[in-house]
Amino acid sequence: MKTQYTVTLSILAGIGIGAAAVQGLHAQAKPPAFFVVEISKINDAEGFKAITQRPRGGADVAKELGGHYIARTDKITALDGTPPVRFIACAFDSVEKAQAFNNTPYMKEVNAIRDTTTQARSFIVEGMPE
């Protein structure tokens, strides 16, 4: 009876450890994502200031979705080709969260201003799973 109890307990412990390991692997499988904007030319500097002078910054909106800015700069060193005049990158836990960030009312307004004041492109890059 004692042996049967020990075997049953060992099997249950193995199932529990296996389930925890599968959950851990599943959690690691989702790669991070990066929301990226490259501005190649600012056509209307005064109009573009409307983005930088907004009362609520993109960092606050990104933070609500678990994201954070990793670059927001005009200090760019070209290695090959013509560099953008401004570069923005924001890291998120997933492509879905990066897309949700781009679909917020805040970003829709920013994108509309950027579309009329700059020559730019924006995209989401899927990163490597950790």
Roles of regions detected by a PLM:
Residues G14-R86, F92-Q99, E126-E130:
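Short S/T/G/P-rich N-terminal loop/turn motif that feeds into the first structured element of a domain
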